Amino acid sequence: VNDAGQNCIVLFPGANRANTKEHVDEVLSHFGKGDVVVLQNEINLIDYIVDRAYEKEMVIAMNPSPFDQAVMDCDLTKITYFFVNEIEGEMLTGEKDPQKIMAGVLAKYPMSRLILTLGSDGAWYADKDGRCYQEICKVKAVDTTAAGDTFSGYFLASVLGGKTPAQALKTATVASGIAVSRKGAVPSIPTAEEVAQKCGEME
């Protein structure tokens, strides 16, 4: 993490790229309609996973990082939630401006929901019905490991638990803000009680 709180990630795929179709089928056999599959492009066979999950009427959330041809080989019309930063948003749309990224994604994939994270500039949620913005939770960034996972996990848990997208965006932002203020990956992820307390303090 540099002095501005930004991170630099080096990826070594290892076992992440050793999935087989048989293994995917076995795992997905335990899930059905309305269950959630969360994907990041650190594993292989994401196109196959998307297709099988869609057939089962699952909710499909995707973070297309690291962005490469494997993402474009997927039928992205099947994605329920896109979690992207400005770089991935530009790769999907060819646009740099956040407003144009949101418009571009929804033009291509009108049934999807987009969560666009902009680092210190906050985050946006957009779908065919509208958009909402959430500023960052200002903290001293100590370690950004697991911040994105914390954000997406809390957002999905919140919105699927009945919160509005705006409420879910706030909850996710608070949770990831707490996470970056601590060292480590899993140990940095706050409990639901911690997040609820912090959200209450902000009201």
Residue ranges and their predicted role:
Residues Q69-A70, Q99-E203:
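Conserved phosphate-binding/catalytic region of the ribokinase-like
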Residues F12-G14, V84, I136, T191:
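Active-site donor-binding loop signature of nucleotide-sugar glycosyltransferases
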Residues S29-H30, C74-D75, A107:
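Structural alpha-helical scaffold elements that stabilize or flank donor/cofactor-binding regions
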Residues N7-V10, E88-L92, S188:
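A short acidic, helix-capping loop that chelates divalent metal ions and anchors anionic groups
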Residues V1-V36, D51, K56, A196-E203:
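Conserved N-terminal subdomain of the carbohydrate kinase-like
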Residues V36-G104, G122-A123:
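Conserved beta-alpha-beta core of the PfkB/ribokinase-like small-molecule kinase fold
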